[in-house]
Amino acid sequence: MSALGTLSGGAAGVSGLLRLRRRAAPAPAIAAPSHLPAGTVKCAAAVPDAAPIVWGRQLRPALLLPAALLPSLQPARRHTLQPPAAAAESAGEAKSVGFLEKYPALVTGFFFFMWYFLNVIFNILNKKIYNYFPYPYFVSLIHLVVGVVYCLISWSVGLPKRAPINGTLLKLLFPVALCHGIGHITSNVSFAAVAVSFAHTIKALEPFFSAAATQFILGQQVPFSLWLSLAPVVIGVSMASLTELSFNWTGFINAMISNISFTYRSIYSKKAMTDMDSTNVYAYISIIALIVCIPPALIFEGPKLMQHGFSDAIAKVGLTKFVSDLFLVGLFYHLYNQIATNTLERVAPLTHAVGNVLKRVFVIGFSIIVFGNKISTQTGIGTSIAIAGVAMYSYIKAKIEEEKRKKSA
């Protein structure tokens, strides 16, 4: 209590702390460091080793030193090594993990959803256009025009940055683009001629043509298990074709031609493998395919369009809806193809193959619901068998490719 009374009565600044010492033998003087000027250490020897405790704190001689000199008398602080992540976190500089890196499964699911959604919307809107504007060559051309404009705008803003192209690469991409253009036109002729569900059922035969081309054109052995899985596809398409109410030879033949064209596109794509990213490759293919598709559109449909094609469509739905439908269907066509490519880059081939089969199921199912297409029982069974066969084929092929990659790794 006497100490506290002394502190309360005479503590005015640091000098008041000197009265709080016991009468004891003086401690040895603390020598000032050599780098400090004389007289900077004040009363260091006047405070004994057993300094008094005031309010739970022990007085130290350092309290009597100027604040600027305190660090020089303090012991060096040890720095412990920490892992980079822990060190950054302790300093408040930890890099925040973005949503895309934190939830990759959700992002992949979003890609699949957009792929299905855009594909279904494209097929439905495309068929609605053909119901009042039956000119598939011109509509196919519009698909590519909108896609090319989209690519040019993307290049202009650097999303993505345009990859340079030379004559050698142009020669490699031209056959791919030619097959892409032919397959695109014939697919649309088929979509315009028959029900969307039936056209996609016929297009389920594409793996059969791909296997045949691999075996007999490229000379590569196709495993027997793959051929066996294609049998349900052929049987299912045959059953569906025999009883399809919207069947006509124009739609059937053009769907088969598109299968062959896309098969050759795959073959030429393997020969034209480049280091260019998929977005730029698809952009260049779209530009070349657009040039390829202009002549047949002008030859087969140009005169009819100028005579009554445009005027009839505008009279039915109006100019605004006609133009907006063409723009949207072209945009959906380009985006769903681009998203499909981006999805393939994010997942394993097996996952993509299964997703592609499910996409066809979604398109067939939604087209039947939206357009109210009547299908016979045999057509429904045949379509189901064909889709199941494609799923089996895709699974076996992806497994074989995966085993090849593991062996080569």
Swiss-Prot record:
One term of GO molecular function: organophosphate ester transmembrane transporter activity
Segment annotated as transit peptide: 1-85
Predominant place of localization: plastid
Residue ranges of the TM segments: 105-125, 138-158, 216-236, 281-300, 379-399
GO CC annotation: chloroplast membrane; Golgi apparatus
Protein's GO biological process: monocarboxylic acid transport; transmembrane transport
Keywords per UniProt: Chloroplast, Membrane, Plastid, Transit peptide, Transmembrane, Transmembrane helix, Transport
Annotated compartments: Plastid, Chloroplast membrane
Chloroplast intermembrane side: 86-104, 159-215, 301-378
Site note May be essential for binding and transport of phosphoenolpyruvate, residues: S225
InterPro entries per UniProt: Sugar_P_trans_dom, Tpt_PEP_transl, TPT_transporter
SUPFAM superfamilies: Multidrug resistance efflux transporter EmrE (SSF103481)
Membrane topology: Multi-pass membrane protein
Keyword Chloroplast belongs to the record: yes
Residues in the Lumenal compartment per record: 126-137, 237-280, 400-409
Keyword Transmembrane annotated: yes
Family: Belongs to the TPT transporter family. TPT (TC 2.A.7.9) subfamily.
Function of the protein: Mediates the export of fixed carbons from the chloroplasts into the cytosol in the form of triose phosphates. In addition, it can also bind and transport phosphoenolpyruvate, thereby increasing the photosynthetic efficiency of C4-plants.
PANTHER family: SOLUTE CARRIER FAMILY 35 (PTHR11132)
Complexes and interactors: Homodimer.
Record protein name field: Triose phosphate/phosphate translocator, chloroplastic
Organism, scientific name: Zea mays
Gene that this polypeptide is encoded by: TPT
